[in-house]
From Swiss-Prot:
The protein, known as: ATP synthase subunit a 3
Self-association and partners: F-type ATPases have 2 components, CF(1) - the catalytic core - and CF(0) - the membrane proton channel. CF(1) has five subunits: alpha(3), beta(3), gamma(1), delta(1), epsilon(1). CF(0) has three main subunits: a(1), b(2) and c(9-12). The alpha and beta chains form an alternating ring which encloses part of the gamma chain. CF(1) is attached to CF(0) by a central stalk formed by the gamma and epsilon chains, while a peripheral stalk is formed by the delta and b chains.
Organism taxonomic ancestry: Bacteria, Pseudomonadati, Thermodesulfobacteriota, Desulfuromonadia, Desulfuromonadales
Family matches, as NCBIfam families: ATP_synt_6_or_A
Topology of the protein relative to the lipid bilayer: Multi-pass membrane protein
Function: Key component of the proton channel; it plays a direct role in the translocation of protons across the membrane.
Gene responsible for this protein: atpB3
Example of a GO MF term: proton-transporting ATP synthase activity, rotational mechanism
Cross-referenced InterPro entries: ATP_syn_F0_a_bact/chloroplast (IPR045082), ATP_synth_F0_asu (IPR000568), ATP_synth_F0_asu_AS (IPR023011), F0_ATP_A_sf (IPR035908)
Family as reported in the entry's similarity comment: Belongs to the ATPase A chain family.
Main location class: membrane
Gene3D superfamilies: ATP synthase, F0 complex, subunit A
Any one Gene Ontology BP term: proton motive force-driven plasma membrane ATP synthesis
Length: 229
């Protein structure tokens, strides 16, 4: 759902030659804005690293350290190589969710194209990791433990794996787009202060959805690393 007044309205006009819908143009604009903000924050936090961190460096270390601990607790030590992927997706989804709470801003995750792109990255990464780890033996993950049931199990497993990006896409999109709709309705029907509790709930929803997306990413990658039985 598009806000009546958009902070990056001018970018919609710049993207007009691409013949994107208004919602897609807004999602692209705010996606690039979020990428720029995250790059700027990373630069500012790391340009003068200190042994005893403070300010922005301390804040970023808390976030990165928390995600790293979550990765190692969920996947074990062998999950560390995949920490950058999990952290990048998690932080991007979280900031994309939260930015929609600012009046005039649009959350890219309320557009199905953005959530689908994130889900496809997770889907492809999962299978690339599995093939890299097991080689041709990765196919055993789809065959099941009983040889004569292999054709049936293969079909079921393929459907199950294909449903993963669909569920990731629709879960995040549905929650964030639904929240946008509710906020717009409340702001249209009630004074400014009345919708504030809904905005506070939006903060909680934003964190939960980012956490769920990261958790499922780790579970899927962990599954591809395990030996087939």
């Amino acid at each position: 759902m598009v806000h009546p007044f958009l902070f990056l309205e001018f970018l919609r006009k710049m993207l007009a030659p691409l013949h994107l819908s208004e919602a897609s143009a807004d999602a692209v604009s705010y996606t690039w804005l979020i990428i720029a903000l995250l790059l700027l924050l990373s630069f500012l936090a790391t340009r003068a690293l200190k042994t005893v961190p403070g300010g922005l460096q301390n804040f970023m270390e808390i976030i990165v350290g928390g995600i790293e601990n979550m990765v190692t607790e969920t996947m074990g030590e062998h999950g560390r190589p995949y920490f950058p992927l999990v952290a990048t997706i998690g932080i991007f989804v979280l900031v994309s969710n939260l930015i929609g709470l600012i009046p005039g801003f649009f959350p890219p995750t309320a557009n199905i194209n953005t959530t689908a792109a994130c889900a496809i990255v997770v889907f492809l990464s999962t299978h690339v990791v599995g093939i890299k780890r097991h080689g041709i033996g990765y196919i055993k993950h789809f065959c099941g433990p009983i040889l004569w049931l292999t054709p049936i199990m293969f079909f079921i497993e393929v459907i199950g794996h294909l449903s993963r990006p669909v569920s990731l896409t629709l879960r995040l999109f549905g929650n964030m787009n639904g929240h946008e709709l509710v906020l717009i309705i409340f702001f249209g029907l009630a004074p400014f202060l009345v919708p504030l509790p809904m905005m506070l709930m939006g903060v909680l929803v934003s964190f939960i959805q980012a956490f769920v997306f990261m958790l499922l990413t780790m579970i899927y990658i962990q599954g591809s690393l395990e030996e087939a039985h």
